Curated annotation (Swiss-Prot):
Binding site for substrate: 15, 47, 67, 77-78, 163, 197, 215-216, 225-226
Family the entry assigns: Belongs to the diaminopimelate epimerase family.
Pathway: Amino-acid biosynthesis; L-lysine biosynthesis via DAP pathway; DL-2,6-diaminopimelate from LL-2,6-diaminopimelate: step 1/1
Record key words, sorted: Amino-acid biosynthesis, Cytoplasm, Isomerase, Lysine biosynthesis
Catalytic activity: (2S,6S)-2,6-diaminopimelate = meso-2,6-diaminopimelate
Annotated site residue numbers, Could be important to modulate the pK values of the two catalytic cysteine residues: 165, 215
UniProt-recorded name of the protein: Diaminopimelate epimerase
PANTHER family assigned: DIAMINOPIMELATE EPIMERASE, DIAMINOPIMELATE EPIMERASE, CHLOROPLASTIC
Gene symbol of the encoding locus: dapF
Assembly and oligomerization: Homodimer.
Enzyme Commission number(s): 5.1.1.7
InterPro entries assigned to the protein according to its UniProt record, in alphabetical order: DAP_epimerase_AS (IPR018510), DAP_epimerase_DapF (IPR001653)
Top-rank EC class of the record's enzyme: isomerase
Amino acid sequence: MAELAQFAKMNGLGNAIIVADMRGRADRVRPEAAQRLASDPATHFDQIMAIHDPRLEGTENYIEIINSDGSVAQACGNGMRCVVQRLAAETGRPSFTFETIAGVLSAEEHANGLISVDMGKPRFGWQDIPLAEEFHDTRKIELQVGPIDKPVLHSPSVASMGNPHAIFWVEDDPYSYDLERFGPMLENHPIFPERANITIARVDSPEELTMRTWERGAGLTLACGSAACAAAVSAARTGRTGRGVKVNLPGGSLEILWRDDDHVIMTGPAEWEFSGRFDPATGAWERETEGAA
């Protein structure tokens, strides 16, 4: 067995996260190790946030994001808050800058324990999301579920927060839709060459949304931070809301602000559950401590 790596089992509004400390190591978390951890009820996760040594000058760490199916993800807002909470507890510092596959992100822990992450700038071009077909206006694209004359879901807004998102707007309860059925089909629709995160969202007021998400590579989730950001900017872009909204998710609420400089700021909590050690090659693990940090 290889030398074990430290990890913290955490959650961001119920979005199950493993923060893996891979600093000082040359190896990576292998897909089969991720799948093994995800299949264990004690360590089941939506994303692994693997903290590596910095590769880019001016950043503290490189963060690799791994889905529960072993695939690599470009963004995970809830996971970034968990990383910040752990590193802030370790270093006593409130602010950090990270490199991810999607670019550089900055984050800060506030005195009240909430954590803000600058998720960067959204992208709306069809090639940037990406889509398999050209759409000049991605505020609403041609895509539907159900009969042509009476679709169940249709005309989503699409956007990228470093990862692709489709947001279906509804006027009734987002929980009344069978997302467990529609989610996999839409995630893997040919229009999305890199697959997509699928969200059903309702506008409650000009300052509030309610939504739920089928997460690419992870499935139904209690919270998806990048999806909340994508829904918030899409709501503002289509005139449904202002640029600052409260987003209600199954696991709780996030505050999303689309600033005038085009950066999207996500604010919410992170919670530690227990710590342990694991083998990044196989996923074998052992528990060390548990309880609230």
